[in-house]
Amino acid sequence: MSTRELIVLGTSSAVPTKRRAHNGYFLRWDGHGILFDPGEGTQRQMRYAGISAHDITRVCVTHFHGDHSLGLPGVIQRIARDGVTHPVRVAYPAAGQEYWERLRYATSFVDTEVIEAQPLAGDEVVVSGEDEFTVTALPLDHSIPTYGYRIAEPDRVHMLADRLAARGIRGPAVGRLKAEGFLIDAAGNRVELADYSVVRPGQVFAFVMDTGVCDTAVRLAERADLLVIEATFLNAEAELAARYRHLTAGQAGMIAAQAGVRRLVLTHFSERYGREEEDRFIAEAAACFSGEIVLAQDVMRVAVPSRRSEGGGTVAGA
């Protein structure tokens, strides 16, 4: 049984608070574990959430501000200490190479060879390493070079068992129909794959952190089943958001609406806001976005919504 869920480790922005740790987000995707933006204290939050170093197969860093990267030394040294043997690929902006080097070798420790650095440069980068899904990085609009990430699995064709049975198509004929897109039946009639199958779009996860409003944020989030996006400020602080190239809750909702997102997770909240203002984040995002909205809390788990489907009928082997 596959498991696809987001485990939120930290939800504050530049300064952690008593209730909110620095950033940290762990995406469990079947046998893969992708750690996004490990801020200060990520190791400790992993312990609370039941995540081990062995669970991490990839790390994605959006940019090298401290709240998104100060946890890297501890995570890397924990990977080394715990004897992780599988490759752990780390994607990050190539423009921050000097900061990567400092964090990678921040203190003395018995090093590991499993860390594979993947510096990113360019307007659109397909990050290599996984066969089951594609990792795409696009630049965002922040004060230093920053990338957002999109995890997408390919669409799949599933055969409709009830329609196949009604037409008398079975056995090897089903395989030929799926492979070739059509077949000629015993009566000489052409049978089209589209009439006996349904396209199941692959699931999509998007991670948009530290940016002003920009086209690439929408592109990253396009038709995402789950979007994790910063909402540093409430709408009243729109001027501050623009000055520091961050998003308001309303802008996060607008991006989600434009992209056709299914489930929206708001996070990366300024320390100026307390518990009594949390409902305002949801309300301001909901003014633009009609889908499901989750206000992230530390050590929260959020499921990736089940796959979308197009067409109808019983799916064979689903």
Swiss-Prot record:
Binding positions for Zn(2+) 1 per the UniProt entry: 63, 65, 142, 210
The keyword tRNA processing appears for this protein: yes
Assigned keywords, A-Z: Endonuclease, Hydrolase, Metal-binding, Nuclease, tRNA processing, Zinc
EC number: 3.1.26.11
Subunit-structure text: Homodimer.
Catalysed transformations (reactions): Endonucleolytic cleavage of RNA, removing extra 3' nucleotides from tRNA precursor, generating 3' termini of tRNAs. A 3'-hydroxy group is left at the tRNA terminus and a 5'-phosphoryl group is left at the trailer molecule
Keyword Transcription: no
Protein name: Ribonuclease Z
Residue numbers binding Zn(2+) 2: 67-68, 210, 268
GO molecular function: 3'-tRNA processing endoribonuclease activity; zinc ion binding
Names of the cofactor(s): Zn(2+)
Active-site residues per Swiss-Prot or TrEMBL entry: 67 (proton acceptor)
Origin: domain of life: Bacteria
Note on cofactor: Binds 2 Zn(2+) ions.
Organism: Thermobifida fusca (strain YX)
Function: Zinc phosphodiesterase, which displays some tRNA 3'-processing endonuclease activity. Probably involved in tRNA maturation, by removing a 3'-trailer from precursor tRNA.
Major enzyme class: hydrolase
SUPFAM superfamilies for this protein: Metallo-hydrolase/oxidoreductase (SSF56281)
Gene3D superfamilies: Ribonuclease Z/Hydroxyacylglutathione hydrolase-like
Family classification: Belongs to the RNase Z family.
